[in-house]
Swiss-Prot record:
One of its GO terms (molecular function) is ATP binding. Residues 1-35 are annotated as: Disordered. It comes from Rattus norvegicus. This is ATP-dependent RNA helicase DDX39A. It catalyses: ATP + H2O = ADP + phosphate + H(+). ATP binds at residues 88-95.
Length: 427
């Protein structure tokens, strides 16, 4: 199918496609276009958003005190049901925006799915479902389920039949399969969310799935889309799903530098990478480390080498069964292992709060992937360190692209690094 046909498929519904039910709703606030710079701690607290007491209790339990700029800009409009298109750097708490906004508005009705959240990877879907569970801790009537490929669809169908969730998180392929098998009914969806939306809308096959799912939801609903990278080309595609959205672009896309993150490179031969990595792990102070490699084979081999050198390492890659991947992800998140070796599969949207060092053992294939990898360190405005190994001319070219695009200077790794520049000091 031609790109033009796909664009045309995104046009709005015909008015007679679905009976319109008049809804009592708060009039939408005027459209707001927000641009700004990131401030790690905003002066107002979450209480200013007038959230449900159950949500405020959960927020306190999670240790959040002040909303980030993205949360400050988006949440007041999002809880009124306004459509939101948001681009902001990794680690700024975008997930909490739609989780809190949808839980604030939800009125759980047995047997009805009210919230549908989709993202492009299984791991991210799993993580988002965990965020819903964290924030709905004091809302026992709200049921959350996550559905994605790689696990038995029969189990998913049983869950939908016997214990229908109010919040569904999943990947487009599995969601569409459940809809086609008539297990998942989307006729009562009031909130439609895409996280890392550019990844889903840039890939034509995934975009078609998203469009088909979108058409099966009611015309009147809230639509929210979020991403760390939102090119000027993809923004009009996003807008076709929305009605007069509030658009929040925190920082210009060419300046996606991460506050508090120190970025360095090391020039070396491919054969020298292991020795250099071991040396750095010996001398650097770290809470947790993520090491990115380019293939499953390298991932397995490097993790094995690290274990043999007595480093507490664990690997996650696409060659594993889904249950094993999620189990290992949870082990790392629970601090049972301090070093994770991963392929790009893990690079985007994963939120591990204790990670303060990221190694690009193999250079990422482009500047976007670089951003999503290094953003694993220094999330929520904390300090972190990113070290990239450069072993050939192509690596050097990509590093130059990163520096040009994001207007950052990635310097050569010095002999010694002041620990206070990349790790939070206890007071």
């Amino acid at each position: 199918m031609a790109e033009q046909d796909v664009e045309n498929e995104l046009l709005d519904y015909d008015e007679d496609e679905e009976p319109q039910v008049p809804q009592e709703s708060t009039p939408a606030p005027p459209k707001k276009d927000v641009k700004g710079s990131y401030v790690s701690i905003h002066s107002s607290g979450f209480r200013d958003f007038l959230l449900k007491p159950e949500l405020l209790r959960a927020i306190v339990d999670c240790g959040f005190e002040h909303p980030s700029e993205v949360q400050h800009e988006c949440i007041p409009q999002a809880i009124l049901g306004m459509d939101v298109l948001c681009q902001a750097k990794s680690g700024m708490g975008k997930t909490a925006v739609f989780v809190l906004a949808t839980l604030q508005q939800i009125e759980p009705i047995n047997g009805q799915v009210s919230v549908l959240v989709m993202c492009h990877t299984r791991e991210l879907a799993f993580q988002i479902s965990k965020e819903y569970e964290r924030f709905s801790k004091y809302m026992p009537s709200v049921k959350v389920s996550v559905f994605f490929g790689g696990l038995s669809i029969k189990k998913d169908e049983d869950v939908l039949k016997k214990n229908c969730p109010h919040v569904v998180v999943g990947t487009p392929g599995r969601i569409l399969a459940l809809v086609r098998s008539r297990s998942l009914n989307l006729r009562n969806v009031k909130h439609f969310v895409l996280d890392e939306c550019d990844k889903m809308l840039e890939q034509l096959d995934m975009r078609r799935d998203v469009q088909e799912i979108f058409r099966l939801t009611p015309h009147e609903k809230q639509c929210m889309m979020f991403s760390a990278t939102l090119s000027k080309e993809i923004r009009p595609v996003c807008r076709k799903f929305m009605q007069d959205p509030m658009e929040v672009f925190v920082d210009d896309e060419t300046k996606l530098t991460l506050h508090g993150l120190q970025q360095y490179y090391v020039k070396l031969k491919d054969s020298e990478k292991n020795r250099k990595l071991f040396d750095l792990l010996d001398v650097l102070e770290f809470n947790q480390v993520v090491i990115f490699v380019k293939s499953v084979q390298r991932c397995m081999a490097l993790a094995q080498l690290l274990v043999e050198q007595n480093f507490p390492a664990i690997a996650i890659h696409r060659g594993m069964a889904q249950e094993e991947r999620l189990s290992r992800y949870q082990q790392f998140k629970d601090f049972q292992r301090r070093i994770l070796v991963a392929t790009n599969l893990f690079g985007r949207g994963m939120d591990i709060e204790r990670v303060n060092i990221v190694f690009n053992y193999d250079m990422p294939e482009d500047s976007d992937t670089y951003l999503h990898r290094v953003a694993r360190a220094g999330r929520f405005g904390t300090k972190g360190l990113a070290v990239t190994f450069v072993s050939d001319e192509n690596d050097a070219k990509i590093l130059n692209d990163v520096q040009d695009r994001f207007e950052v200077n990635v310097a050569e790794l010095p002999e010694e690094i002041d620990i206070s520049t990349y790790i939070e000091q206890s007071r």
